UniProtKB/Swiss-Prot annotation:
Similarity section: Belongs to the 5'-3' exonuclease family. XRN2/RAT1 subfamily.
ZnF locations on chain (CCHC-type): 270-287
SUPFAM superfamilies documented for this protein: Retrovirus zinc finger-like domains
Subcellular location: Nucleus
Gene3D superfamilies assigned to the protein according to its UniProt record, in alphabetical order: 1.25.40.1050, 3.40.50.12390
Biased amino acid composition, Acidic residues: 617-629, 643-660
Protein name: 5'-3' exoribonuclease 2
Keywords for the protein's UniProt record, in alphabetical order: Coiled coil, Exonuclease, Hydrolase, Metal-binding, mRNA processing, Nuclease, Nucleus, rRNA processing, Transcription, Transcription regulation, Transcription termination, Zinc, Zinc-finger
Chain intervals for the UniProt region annotation (Disordered): 411-448, 532-678, 962-1033, 1069-1127
Native organism: Cryptococcus neoformans var. neoformans serotype D (strain JEC21 / ATCC MYA-565)
């Protein structure tokens, strides 16, 4: 989720939630012939962490990214080798947890349109950064050649793997799907510990984000009485939103598993990426960068595997149970609904679907600010902000009003803090430079000798060691340097240049005799080239011409440097050639995602700095344009404009917000200034909004939206869209996708001061269907990544007569928007017009091959079981024996409470051979025999909408927090005892990274204190009703109910008042099966929109619908397929 530093903030504020994972490692034993062999981990042994796990869920994108482009070691050469790395990593994670019932592996499928805006931005920036790095690599090669060294053709033509391939619909994702099926079948056949597992694979052909498909499955399962209320869950992933999603399930026995990104290497402190020395970072380094031979392949460093940690959601619930209690409330406290409010307030700070409000930064304590407002206003609000995934708009207005009162103070304090921080950084940099100068002086003193008044210095002379070795075996070897007078050492390079030029004008014998002088002249040419590359804006045009001419003359006079005509014509950038030839090292300041900046995840957590690249920053921001205006005719650019990194002279004006005002400057080229990205990832630029100065609102709306503050109607549209987004996100987390095609049509958020009449906003969502995979690829890919699309679709991204060419600008603005780090800038890309995109795609569909049409279709979830599983014979007899045509409900007794329905898998033949999908890997041969079976699996219908309650039969775990821990929380982290402290990783006593306390991850003191039970609950565990009206005394608990009558529903102030229509009663009466509205208006289910590809399918996205799999509707009570099969 888009909340950088959330995990760090949580682990610092609630220290006991983090536990170190204990994992068994394979033992090395002596084999029967005396050889050393590795004994595999016995999966059936007890879990070494002291607790057993029922269900393990893997957000596979968090595994695929670090395996395909790892940090600190070379990436696998081929995609088949990447599959092997994914197998190894997945097996390590599974062996840590050892689930006993279900292993679910979910890969991101087509995302909701609201997420595509972020995906589009990240992929365009990834392509831009990849192009910058490739340009820097070529410049470094040119510099290396200018020094007289040869570069192999393989090195010169090497191309990096495009990380954008990790997107649904690409051939890579197709290979990933079949490879995981092969690996799962292999494990079920060869590992006896897997015999009772049910493995569910939801690959990229199944719509939905991986983690949300997992949570949708959990919500559906817990709506049935066969579900065990004490099921133990673990979910793996790098995104911080997994914490929020786990809390939102209201399944209390939940843990989040992730790599400990704060763990320090066992090899000691990290060296500077610039000079290779320890003790400082690259941002404070004064030395020249180390230069590496591009012909030398990078060698993997031998480091211990990174440790893993658990985040205990049950312990986090204990902390929140203390923090969220408000004394003197006029209604009973409900922990579950209070947790929902806490989650909702975090959405204000950041999420993947909306830009955060300008006044809210998590590092400035934004969550605590909102929590303080919530605690102060809760009694006056008369109830909670949220209601089982629905937002009470009137109460949301109260929170926004409280924040609005503090915005001016927040902006001023932010500026003061930034100035103090800059002053402190400047002081540290000066001190560090002084220390480096002293170290350099001491080093020079060691290499200096004074004899008879003459100062001698050491001059490198590699030939000294090649003159026959030592003078005598008893003597040391010759030194690799000569001692010369200092004055001669200074004059030596100039003499070498003159000597080389004279030699070049002579005969071949002169050239041979003066090889050293010629080589040194080559070095001078390289230095001139490097000076031009480093010159930046400080070198004027005449100087650059002079340098270029001088370099050209030297190149013509040097026989060892051969430059092609293309190299002579190639234009050089003005920044230092460093690129991928430099050792990247581990990023300083990484917070969440262990992902390089070019592919920032997600799951985009973290403060990952970007290298010394250049980004474009806008002087005039763009605004959403009239995309859907039938009179709008997009301008076209020539195909040649897509080549290179030259500034574009056209402004894209086809954004799809028909509410945006006309832009009179749309046809004028916007000047772009290149900003230098410093070594620490910061960007130097001038902030033209100045939020800390009076009049900032006028400047903000003029610069960011192109309107005046007095244009109230436009600002109201922005605030309504933003509030729609908050409602959409909350419902997405609790009930499923409200509308697949909704998105926020602006690049920036409004101020809290500008929200007015929120309670009267008419917010509702209409049902829609997800994109097909190729439609998403066209929507999020830049033209540079078109290779992953079928050839007929690639022309849509580059041909000058393409109707959607304007979706793929070759260059785009980066607005730093008051931020410091380059990765925090806003990419001002045009919003895509869905109708134009789908129309263009449809015109090319007939040109696709059968296999490409298969890749462009929605797929099925697949369940795998071993031949010893109780379900095996049932599936063989009823599915493959009779070849069932209708989905068959799963026997919940044989499945241990797991519900759903199944159909035969057309790709599975029981007891047959599974051909390997990666034949180049000898360790992965054909699987014969294959003792597993696979079936198409459909999620069950959701018996009722998800409710924020603990289910009946829940057994609490022993309390983790002591009374002193609770007192520390009540004091806001001030005074008292903080609780058991923990280690941030590494070897034993090594302390953790930023934001982590010292000590060790441990379970804390003995759990002697009993768990404080929640208030009395209804039949289904709900506590104290679902919503509250005026702050009048209410009964201590709602009427006992089994979904009939009872607690209030969506939008009604009094939970005990009779609902005026069938949908108003929320969970007490039949709830709407399609997307619901907000406020007091009754909901009328709309008709689903027509399917742009074929006949309209049933509505998708609401919980009572079928699972993510597809097929014919099953009998009543089973899962069903909301989309007809296209295969």
């Amino acid at each position: 989720m888009g909340v950088p530093a959330l995990f760090r903030w949580l682990s610092k504020k609630y220290p006991k939630i983090v536990e170190r994972v204990k994992e068994d490692t394979p033992k090395k034993i002596r084999g029967p012939d005396g050889e050393i062999v590795e004994e595999p981990i016995r999966y059936e042994n007890p879990n070494p962490n002291g607790f057993e796990v029922d269900n393990l869920y893997l957000d596979m994108n968090g595994i695929v990214h670090p395996c395909t482009h790892p940090e600190g070691r070379p990436a696998p050469e081929t995609e088949e080798e990447m599959m092997v790395e994914i197998f190894k990593y997945t097996e390590r994670v599974v062996n840590m947890c050892r689930p006993r019932k279900v292993l679910m592996m979910a890969i991101d499928g087509v995302a909701p349109r609201a997420k595509m805006n972020q995906q589009r931005s990240r992929r365009f920036r990834a392509a831009q950064e990849a192009a910058d790095k490739e340009e820097e690599r070529r410049e470094a090669i040119k510099l290396f050649e200018a020094m007289g060294h040869a570069v192999s053709e393989e090195t010169a033509n090497h191309k990096s793997w495009d990380t954008n391939a990790i997107t649904p619909g690409t051939p890579f994702m197709d290979l990933l799907s079949i490879s995981l099926k092969y690996w799962v079948s292999h494990k079920l056949t060869t590992d006896p510990g897997w015999k009772d597992l049910k493995i569910i694979l939801s690959d990229s052909s199944v719509p939905g984000e991986g983690e949300h498909k997992i949570m949708d499955w959990i919500r559906r399962q817990r709506s049935y009485p066969t579900w065990d209320a004490n099921t133990s869950h673990v979910i793996y992933g790098l995104d911080a939103d997994l914490i929020m999603l786990s809390l939102a399930t209201h399944e209390p026995h939940f843990r989040v598993l992730r790599e400990d990104v704060f763990a320090q290497s066992s090899k000691g402190p990290h060296a500077c990426k610039n000079c290779g020395k320890v003790g400082h970072i690259a941002a404070n380094c004064k030395s020249d960068k180390k230069f590496k031979d591009p012909n030398v392949a990078e060698v993997a460093k031998t480091e211990d595997p990174k440790p893993f940690i658990f985040l205990d959601v049950a312990c986090l619930r204990e902390y929140l149970a203390v923090e969220l209690v408000v004394p003197g409330m006029p209604f009973p406290f409900d922990l579950e609904l209070a947790i929902d409010d806490w989650i909702f307030m975090i959405f204000f700070v950041g999420n993947d679907f909306l830009p955060h409000l300008p006044s809210l930064e998590i590092r400035e304590g934004a969550i605590d600010v909102l929590l303080k407002i919530w605690r102060a206003e809760l009694p006056r609000m008369g109830g909670y902000l949220t209601n089982h995934g629905k937002v009470n708009l009137d109460r949301a207005q109260v929170i926004l009003e409280g924040l609005a009162k503090s915005e001016d103070e927040i902006f001023q304090k932010r500026k003061d803090d930034e100035e103090r921080q800059e002053h402190s950084q400047k002081r540290r940099r000066i001190e560090e430079h002084k220390r480096q100068d002293e170290d350099k002086a001491r080093e020079e003193d060691r290499n200096t000798l004074t004899l008879n008044g003459t100062e001698y210095v050491a001059v490198d002379n590699p030939a000294a060691t090649a003159r026959g070795g030592p003078l005598h075996p008893s003597l040391p070897s010759r030194p690799a340097f000569d001692l010369v007078p200092k004055e001669d050492a200074v004059k030596q390079p100039e003499d070498q240049d003159q000597k080389a030029k004279k030699a070049m004008a002579g005969s071949n014998s002169d050239i041979v005799k003066n090889r050293k002088a010629i080589r040194m002249a080559n070095m001078s040419a390289a230095q001139a080239l490097k000076a031009e590359l480093e010159g930046g804006n400080d070198v004027n045009v005449d100087d650059k011409k002079a340098i270029a001419q001088e370099g050209k003359e030297e190149d013509e006079a040097v026989v060892t440097v051969e430059r092609t005509e293309d190299e002579e014509k190639e234009q050089l950038t003005k920044e230092e050639a460093r690129g991928t030839l430099e050792e990247q090292g581990e990023k300083e300041g990484v917070d969440e995602e262990v992902v390089p900046p070019a592919i920032q995840t997600d799951e985009d957590e973290g403060e990952a700095p970007v290298g010394d690249a250049t980004v474009a920053e806008n002087d005039e921001s763009t605004t959403p344009e009239d995309d859907e205006d039938p009179t709008h005719v997009p301008r076209k650019r020539k195909r040649g404009d897509s080549d290179g990194d030259e500034d574009s002279n056209e402004e894209d004006d086809d954004d799809d917000d028909d509410d945006a005002p006309p832009n009179p400057e749309a046809d004028q080229p916007i000047p772009k200034k290149k900003l230098k990205v410093n070594a620490d990832g910061t960007v130097d630029y001038e902030d033209d909004v100045k939020l800390w100065e009076p009049g900032y609102r006028e400047r903000y709306y003029e610069k960011k939206f192109g309107v005046k503050l007095s244009e109230r109607e436009f600002i109201d549209k922005v605030t309504k869209s933003y509030m729609e987004g908050l409602c959409w996100v909350l419902e997405y987390y609790y009930q499923g996708v409200p509308a697949w095609d909704w998105f926020y049509p602006y690049h920036y958020a409004p101020f809290a001061q500008d929200f007015r009449d929120v309670g009267s906003m008419d917010i509702k969502f209409e049902t829609s269907i997800p994109f097909k995979p190729f439609a998403q690829l066209l929507g999020v890919f830049p033209a540079a990544s078109r290779i992953h699309l079928p050839e007929p679709l690639q022309t849509l991204m580059i041909d000058e007569d393409s109707p959607i060419l304007d979706f793929y600008p070759p260059d785009f603005e980066i607005d730093m928007n008051g931020k410091k780090m380059a990765w925090q800038g806003v990419a001002l890309l045009p919003f895509i017009d869905q109708n134009r995109l789908l129309t263009a795609l449809k015109s090319k569909e007939e040109l696709l091959s059968d296999d490409e049409k298969r890749r462009n279709s929605w797929g099925d979830n697949v369940m795998f079981i071993a031949n010893e599983n109780p379900l095996y014979d049932l599936f063989c007899d009823k599915l493959y024996g009779l070849r069932a045509k209708d989905p068959i409900p799963i026997d919940t007794k044989a499945s241990y409470g797991i519900t759903g329905s199944v159909l035969p898998d057309p790709n599975c033949v029981p007891a047959s051979t599974f051909d390997t999908p990666i034949p180049s890997i000898s360790e992965c041969p054909d699987l014969n025999p294959n003792d597993s079976i696979s079936v198409r699996y459909y999620f069950p219908r959701q018996a009722h909408p998800h409710r924020s309650i603990l289910l009946r039969g829940y057994k609490p775990e022993p309390a983790r927090l002591t009374e002193s821990d609770k007192d520390w929380v009540r004091r806001g982290g001030q005074g008292g005892r903080r609780g058991h402290r923990h280690n941030g990783g590494g070897n034993g006593n090594v302390t953790g990274g930023p934001g982590m306390a010292r000590g060790r991850y441990e379970s804390g003191p003995p759990r002697t204190n009993g768990y404080q039970p929640p208030p009395p609950r209804s039949n289904y565990g709900g506590s104290s009703g679902y919503g509250y009206g005026a702050p009048a005394p209410l009964p201590s608990r709602p009427p006992v109910s089994s979904y009939g009558g009872g607690a209030g529903g969506y939008g009604y102030s009094n939970p005990y008042a009779a609902a005026p229509n069938p949908y108003a009663g929320g969970y007490g009466a039949p709830a709407p099966y399609a997307a619901g509205g907000y406020g007091q208006r009754p909901y009328v289910p709309p008709l689903p929109p027509p399917n742009p590809y074929s006949a309209p399918p049933p509505a998708y996205g609401r919980p009572p619908g079928g699972g993510y799999g597809y097929g014919a509707p099953p009998p009543r009570g089973g899962g069903y397929n909301p989309y007809p099969s296209r295969r």
